[in-house]
Amino acid sequence: MEKDLESHVDDVMSEHGVVGVMCTDDQGLSLIAKGTANPATAGFVQNLAESARKLYPDSEQQPVICLESDACNLLIKSQNKVTIAVHKVPS
């Protein structure tokens, strides 16, 4: 599984504008972090995803969180017990 996850993260990192990717487990532990993604923030990222799910408890789809700043956009989504955070340069 680790090789598959690393391959998927490498694919995301190769997308235009992506400067960092991190995946966490459902306990908030960093599974992998590349580029500008800081593994020390894994717990915060997972907590944001969990809080977003609580805002929409009846939704069948997992919400996507988008945090924007002048320096970076951060997209967060959970699926299948893995939370992914993608750092992108603003377009």
Curated annotation (Swiss-Prot):
InterPro entries: LAMTOR5. Signal peptide: none annotated. It holds the Pfam family LAMTOR5. Transmembrane segments: none annotated. The keyword Ligase does not apply. GO terms for cellular component: lysosome; Ragulator complex. GO terms for biological process: cellular response to amino acid stimulus; negative regulation of apoptotic process; positive regulation of TOR signaling; positive regulation of TORC1 signaling; protein localization to lysosome; regulation of cell size. Keywords: Cytoplasm, Lysosome. It is found in: Cytoplasm; Lysosome. Part of the Ragulator complex. Belongs to the LAMTOR5 family. Regulator of the TOR pathway, a signaling cascade that promotes cell growth in response to growth factors, energy levels, and amino acids. As part of the Ragulator complex, may activate the TOR signaling cascade in response to amino acids. This is Ragulator complex protein LAMTOR5 homolog. It comes from Nematostella vectensis (Starlet sea anemone).
